[in-house]
A protein has these predicted regions:
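Acidic, glycine-rich two-metal-ion catalytic cores of nucleic acid-processing enzymes
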Residues: 184-292, 300
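Hydrophobic alpha-helical scaffolding
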Residues: 154, 180, 184, 188, ...
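Long, charged/polar-rich coiled-coil alpha-helical scaffolds that serve as structural arms
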Residues: 159, 163-166, 170-175, 192, ...
């Protein structure tokens, strides 16, 4: 079977749940810290005096998160790599080269897994470094803003605190920028990084297995509702070697056992395609071995009534559901909690309508949870 990023999505989701739980815990910590002694005339003074306690609690959450995710990521990478390798075995199992691959008893490529684990550590290190500072700085700003707002507007301290907490919950812990310059909140950034690195592990397991049996070409699937980044590579043949750019090669016909040759148009290298955006987070394309004379181009899948823009509207609704769930976690009283819950239900109803109106869409409840990547 071909390999695709989707092969490792469940592994990334399991790690993402750790970030999801941490994000909820941090919002609740902040809300409880602000709510304590909220009726006291010395509220602002007491809040500033308790910053040390809040910092300690946040650091405990961040340390526990890092310990849990380090081991979980390593296990996910090994599993993803093995899945990619087994996909190559399943794909070629009926052929002589497939039986040769299946007979090999090969452990995961330790250097490859180590390299990916190090890359993941580099990508997520800013998350742990920023958590404590972001939460404590937000706490200071809210205390200062609430004190000033009361004097200027006359609204209650609880109302002002809730308004500030709602704004923070809408944004999440922000300030994380990926290689493309896009800004992410903490949980979304971390899960995006996990999804990317586990997808890479699955693909590397697959291409390492192909390299062992000297298969040097792969072909990209034709996925419905593709994005502009992937569209140029759909159905194209790519080399696992270093050659770049479109070129044509003549190769032995596998069906004729090498007695004849066939012309193969190669669109570029896999490295080149990935650098251009193929297999980005959320990519639904797959990659299969290309055997001259055996492999045919994938069929096109029409999607009448559903467009790529409809998939992006689904992503937008998912973000709004997550936003209001964060507002639930940040609620300081029952009134705010009830209002946020009503908004969650309203956007969930809109999601049901949107999916029902577009037959090619499938609802993904896990992407509506706090902490799911965008």
């Amino acid at each position: 079977m071909p390999v695709s990023p989707a092969m490792a999505e469940d592994l990334a989701r399991e790690v993402g749940l750790l970030y999801q739980d941490a994000e909820g815990a941090l919002l609740e910590l902040l809300a409880k810290a602000l709510e304590a002694d909220i009726e006291s005339p010395r509220w602002a003074e007491l809040k500033l005096a308790s910053i040390g306690n809040l910092r300690t609690a946040v650091e405990q959450v961040a340390d526990a998160l890092q310990q849990d995710t380090d081991g979980a990521v390593r296990r996910a990478l090994v599993t993803a790599y093995n899945r990619g390798r087994q996909a190559a075995v399943a794909e070629l199992g009926a052929l002589d080269i497939g039986r040769e691959l299946a007979a090999r008893d090969t452990l995961p490529n330790a250097p490859a897994v180590d390299r990916l684990a190090a890359s993941m550590a580099d990508d997520t290190r800013p998350v742990y470094q920023r958590i404590t500072r972001a939460v404590v700085d937000t706490y200071r700003r809210i205390v200062s803003r609430v004190s000033g707002t009361q004097l200027l507007t006359g609204i209650t301290r609880r109302q002002a605190s809730q308004r500030a907490m709602d704004q923070f919950a809408n944004r999440g812990i922000t300030g994380f920028v990926d290689s493309a310059g896009r800004r992410w909140d903490m949980a979304s950034y971390a899960e995006m990084a996990v999804r990317s690195v586990t997808a890479r592990a699955a693909i590397e397991g697959h291409i390492d297995a192909l390299a062992e049996i000297r298969v040097g070409l792969v072909i990209v699937s034709d996925a419905p509702l593709e994005c502009p980044l992937c569209r140029p590579w759909e159905g194209e043949i790519l080399t696992l070697g270093s050659a770049t750019g479109p070129h044509t090669v003549r190769l032995p016909n596998e069906l004729a056992h090498g007695r004849t040759t066939v012309a193969v148009h190669v669109a570029g290298s896999l490295v080149e395609a990935r650098a251009a955006g193929l297999f980005h987070p959320n990519c639904r394309h797959s990659l299969g071995a290309y055997l001259p004379g055996v492999t045919t181009r994938p069929p096109h899948h029409p999607t009448p009534g559903t467009t790529y823009e409809d998939t992006q509207r689904q992503r937008e609704i998912e973000r709004l559901i997550r936003q209001w769930k964060r507002r639930q976690a940040a609620a300081m009283d029952e009134q705010a909690r009830t209002r946020a819950n009503a908004k969650v239900r309203a956007w969930q109803a809109e999601m049901r309508r949107h999916v029902a109106a577009h037959p090619e869409l499938r609802r993904k409840p896990q992407r509506e949870q706090i902490g799911s990547a965008r």
